[in-house]
Amino acid sequence: MFSGLLIILVPLIVGYLIPLRQQAALKVINQLLSWMVYLILFFMGISLAFLDNLASNLLAILHYSAVSITVILLCNIAALMWLERGLPWRNHHQQEKLPSRIAMALESLKLCGVVVIGFAIGLSGLAFLQHATEASEYTLILLLFLVGIQLRNNGMTLKQIVLNRRGMIVAVVVVVSSLIGGLINAFILDLPINTALAMASGFGWYSLSGILLTESFGPVIGSAAFFNDLARELIAIMLIPGLIRRSRSTALGLCGATSMDFTLPVLQRTGGLDMVPAAIVHGFILSLLVPILIAFFSA
């Protein structure tokens, strides 16, 4: 029962216990993580090709991901708008010129291309490709170890997290409203509650959530989680500039775990420098919770 939990948490914790001071080593780890994400998504695509009843399973993936992201985002937006009304976050910043949102979206969609390539190769049916699942398990353990090191050495201290009240509050609201959305999805999609809650715990970190859920629930749920969280990032990129004028909390919350990296430039240019600390704290908390919550619900 707890083997899946241990596979996720042990390498993550061991990595988190390792302090690194050399920036060169951290750059190497970041590059390795990028390559390993592509590798595991490639394995995910191969695993999809070996599914029985392939056509019906692909329709199930599309159905699960479309319903899931719609319900979760609606729950997030409702809760974050309520937060903004009760605890306003004033915006006095004049928006700067934004980075190309099309270029950012294409960068995200490259990961979809890796899954598609793996799927196409898997359709060849070569016998050795059936070991893709085992290969992804070993790669996942190393990836989680490196993620632990990355989280430990990203410059955030406990004091900084505690002091940034807005980032913490928005993160809590996102977690609670996402899990409520997960419960609703369990009812709508007729999924086990723990499966739906695990799918709701990706918070936009599609490269990790898809991998972890494939390991725990199989390639159908894992792929649905991947597209669910990828859609969250793409939607956030498109909505932030217009939304941030009305509700800064909602704009930040929609970014999920990506607010500390991928969507941070958009948040900074549209919301100002005072939004950066909250965005980093918010993204850090959610990034830390993704593997923990998924491991918990998977067990």
Swiss-Prot record:
GO biological process entries: L-lysine transmembrane transport
Organism: Escherichia coli (strain K12)
Gene disruption phenotype: Null mutant is hypersensitive to the lysine antimetabolite thialysine.
Inducers of expression: Repressed by arginine, via the ArgR repressor.
Function, as annotated: Mediates export of lysine.
Main location: membrane
Membrane topology term: Multi-pass membrane protein
Key words, A-Z: Amino-acid transport, Cell inner membrane, Cell membrane, Membrane, Transmembrane, Transmembrane helix, Transport
InterPro entries named among the record's database cross-references: LysO
GO molecular function: L-lysine efflux transmembrane transporter activity
The family this protein is said to belong to: Belongs to the LysO family.
Name this protein carries in UniProt: Lysine exporter LysO
Keyword set includes Transmembrane: yes
Compartment annotation: Cell inner membrane
Coiled-coil segments on the chain, per record: none
Superkingdom field: Bacteria
GO cellular component: a single term: plasma membrane
TM spans (from-to): 1-21, 31-51, 58-78, 109-129, 131-151, 169-189, 207-227, 277-297
